[in-house]
Amino acid sequence: MIIPKNLEELASHVESDQKVVFFFTADWCPDCQFIYPVMPDIEALHPDMTFVRVNRDDYMALAQTWNIFGIPSFVVTKKGQELGRLVNKARKTKEEINAFLATV
């Protein structure tokens, strides 16, 4: 899981030729804490994707631009184009995330 140090590093992943999963989260979010332990398993099941953890509080303007108002949320891009999103305020399970990633 990549944790970008700044907006420029984060932006560089949007244009990637590979599928990139942006995982929007926050340290204070209990539903995000629930999913952290299984993220390595999810990443292992999707080796063709790059995973980028985005702290919504650090990148609030980006979250607003991308209409990320509930966390945890996932947005998948490739070559600057959004391929899919799993964005809502509900707690997400490993199975739900894997099912979503299988569709993009």
Model-found features: residue ranges?
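Chalcogenol-based redox active-site neighborhoods
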Residues: 34, 65-66, 91-95
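Thiol-based oxidoreductase modules, predominantly thioredoxin-like and allied folds used
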Residues: 3-5, 24, 39, 43, ...
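Non-catalytic, surface beta->alpha helical segment in thiol-disulfide oxidoreductase systems
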Residues: 76-104
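Short alpha-helical
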Residues: 30, 58, 92
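Local sequence-structure signature of Cys/Sec-based thiol-disulfide redox active-site neighborhoods
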Residues: 11-41
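N-terminal leader/targeting and pre-domain segments
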Residues: 1-20, 96-104
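Structural micro-motif
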Residues: 66-75
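Short hydrophobic/charged patches on amphipathic alpha-helices used for structural packing
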Residues: 10-11, 60-63
